[in-house]
A protein has these predicted regions:
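Conserved phosphate- and dinucleotide-binding cores of soluble alpha/beta proteins
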Residues: 2-12, 27-44, 55, 61-72, ...
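Glycine-rich phosphate/ribose-binding loops and adjacent secondary-structure elements
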Residues: 12, 50, 271-274, 279, ...
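Short glycine-rich or small-residue beta-strand-to-loop segments that form or flank ligand, phosphate
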Residues: 20-25, 53-56, 573
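Short helix-capping segments at alpha-helix termini
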Residues: 43-48, 312-314, 564
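Glycine-rich phosphate-binding "P-loop"
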Residues: 262-277, 575
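Short beta-strand/loop segment at the start of cytosolic alpha/beta domains
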Residues: 512-538
Length: 588
């Protein structure tokens, strides 16, 4: 069989002017920087290829020079169709300035669209995006006046509205893996995510296009475990061996085995967050976590929810997920966003969104840049600043419970937490609760019609989107409703009888989230069956942190036994029981 190993320059030479090029990557995870660098060099050296259309689900970039930022040269790109834009600011600026045609479509819909392109279907049929800026009745996902072609249309099936995301051919797919044999079979054992490499490869191949894959090592043909091959060689045209500096696992770390499943690391040694407004918000959002549920945490403020869950020892009761395909473990933030420490599974990105879109998330906690009196939220565009929706629309529209998390105002906000009370030291310059959001990334009206529970959590108050509108439901200790809340809103929420936010949110010690979520005190864990003369003790998820906890258990069990007045049989459930090593050493 033909040897498919080529140089980056040789791979770039097969891309033609006017091609539609799909690029893998989520931040720096799976981003083929060796290939992008080769493409950039070819264009700078000879002016070709030119007029490319770029297609990317997430934003393969670092907010600076890497990823798609390499391709922002005038003339190289004619059109870009992307899900998230915040980390490709050079390309985003060209879109905002109207220098290229540009679209922002939901990340999950682009990921799913690859399958429809591969299967030669007319497009993706989905309810995701209805009543948001992606809906053609609003903006159709178009980012500037230069962009005129409709990629999204509204159709009705059986009396129900859907959006049809138009399919188009993929001429070249630029992908990344770990190992390739000389026949082009690709494995991804050191990659933190699988992303969309397989459906994108199929989309390009069935469009009559080319598939080029960057890897970090080459193996002999036939030596790879067939069950670990994620892209079969029949789909791959060229393989490029990357330089190590262009193949980091994430843009923050060269390689971490706990991201890719080679090792597991302890999660109980992480330093707790400092007690500030971010922790208060994360704690209040964490109080909505569903024990035993599946959760998505967004980028930014919601990242703190995972840290609070770890500090409070409740991660074992949850399955945290991230949209590019990780299930379980502890999702990471910053330039590691999208991966998880100690994941239970890593699936393809489009499969994750199938699960999300069908209502698989019990709860999502997402960021909130602007909200209005209808409950609409904007996180995607602010004047000349283009962030993009990413997976926000898929996730927010379909989660069974939705929590938006963010400070009440932005731009220089300073608060103090003293004696369990909140004090505003300096108010933020920008209001976030405004008359009308600049762009509708989440439709409060649609949520009201579907009955979706939606909370807006800030450091000083909590609002909820009800059938009647936005209602103020909780106020932080130390806050005056008129002075500190209503005076900094452009709309007036419903104010009935808001209750105080839980005082434990504002205390430095752990807040006892486990007991709050489970609602199960020690007395509730002990029951007696008189007919069988058996005492049942349920220690499931119970955590003994100090000798005082041991003494508390002893007293409760002795009291129950004295009340029974005779010897009993004992059945104990220790599933998920935890005994701190220091207590074990002191006791035994």
């Amino acid at each position: 069989m033909k040897n498919k190993i080529v140089s980056a320059a040789e791979a770039a030479a097969v891309i033609r002017t006017g091609d539609t090029v799909s690029i893998s990557g989520f931040v720096g995870i799976g981003t083929p920087d060796e290939l992008l660098l080769g493409l950039e060099r070819r264009f700078l050296d000879g002016g070709e290829p030119a007029g490319l259309t770029l297609v990317f689900a997430a934003a393969p970039g670092d907010g600076g020079e890497r990823g798609l930022n390499r391709l922002a040269h005038p003339g190289l790109v004619k059109r870009a169709v992307g899900g998230h834009w915040a980390l490709v600011p050079k390309l985003a600026q060209r879109a905002v300035d109207g220098e290229i045609e540009a679209y922002n479509l939901p990340l999950g819909c682009i990921a799913q669209l690859y399958r429809d392109i591969a299967a030669k279907r007319p497009g993706l049929l989905s309810r995701v995006g209805l009543r948001t800026f992606v809906d053609p009745r609003l903006e159709g996902g178009k980012l500037n006046a230069r962009t005129t072609e409709d990629l999204v249309s509204l159709i009705e099936v059986g009396g129900t509205e859907y959006l049809l995301y138009k399919a188009f051919p993929i001429h070249v797919a630029l992908l990344r893996g770990t190992t390739a044999d000389t026949a082009g079979n690709i494995t991804m054992e050191r990659e933190a995510l699988s992303l969309d490499v397989l459906p994108a490869a199929m989309a390009a191949k069935n469009s009559g296009g080319l598939v080029i894959v960057q890897v970090e090592r080459i193996a002999q043909e036939g030596s790879l475990d067939a069950r670990r091959v994620q892209v079969p060689g029949v789909l791959v045209d060229c393989v490029v061996l990357a330089q190590p500096e262009n193949h980091w696992q994430t843009y923050a770390q060269r390689h971490n085995g706990a991201f890719s499943g080679q090792i597991r690391v302890p999660l109980d040694r992480m330093a707790p967050l400092p007690l500030d407004e971010r922790k208060v918000i994360a704690r209040r959002a964490a109080m909505e976590l569903p024990p035993g549920g599946v959760v998505n945490l967004g980028i930014g403020m919601p990242e703190g929810v995972a840290a609070v869950a770890a500090e409070e020892r409740v991660l074992s009761y949850l399955t945290l997920t991230a949209e590019p395909g990780v299930i379980g473990g502890m999702p990471q933030g910053g330039l590691n966003f999208g991966v998880s420490l100690n994941p239970d599974a890593v699936i393809q990105q489009n499969q994750q969104f199938d699960f999300y879109d069908g209502g698989g998330l019990d709860m999502a906690c997402l960021g909130m840049a602007q909200a209005d009196g209808q409950g609409n939220v904007n996180v995607s565009r602010f004047g000349k600043r283009l962030a993009g929706a990413g997976g926000f629309i898929n996730i927010s529209q379909n989660a069974r419970k939705l929590v938006f998390a963010g400070t009440f105002t932005a731009g220089g906000l300073q608060v103090a937490i003293e004696d369990g009370r909140l004090r505003i030291v300096r108010e933020g310059r920008s209001r976030k609760f405004i008359e009308a959001v600049e762009q509708v990334t989440f439709s409060g009206g649609l949520a009201g019609e579907t009955g979706q529970p939606v909370f807006y959590v800030t450091e000083r108050c909590v609002l909820r989107r009800t059938a009647e509108g936005m209602e103020l439901t909780e106020v932080a200790p130390g806050m005056d409703i008129g002075r500190d809340i209503l005076a900094h809103m452009d709309f007036r929420p419903i104010v009935r009888d808001p209750r105080p936010m839980n005082p434990r949110l504002f205390q430095p010690e752990p807040m006892g989230l486990e007991r709050w979520l489970l609602g199960l005190g020690l007395a509730d864990r002990i029951s007696y069956d008189a007919e069988r003369n058996t005492l049942f003790i349920n220690y499931e998820g119970f955590h003994v942190r100090a000798l005082d906890d041991v003494e508390m258990v002893r007293r409760e069990v002795e009291a129950r036994c004295r009340a029974i007045g005779r010897r009993v049989a004992l059945v104990v459930n220790y599933d998920g029981f935890t005994l701190d090593q220091a207590v074990s050493d002191a006791w035994f």
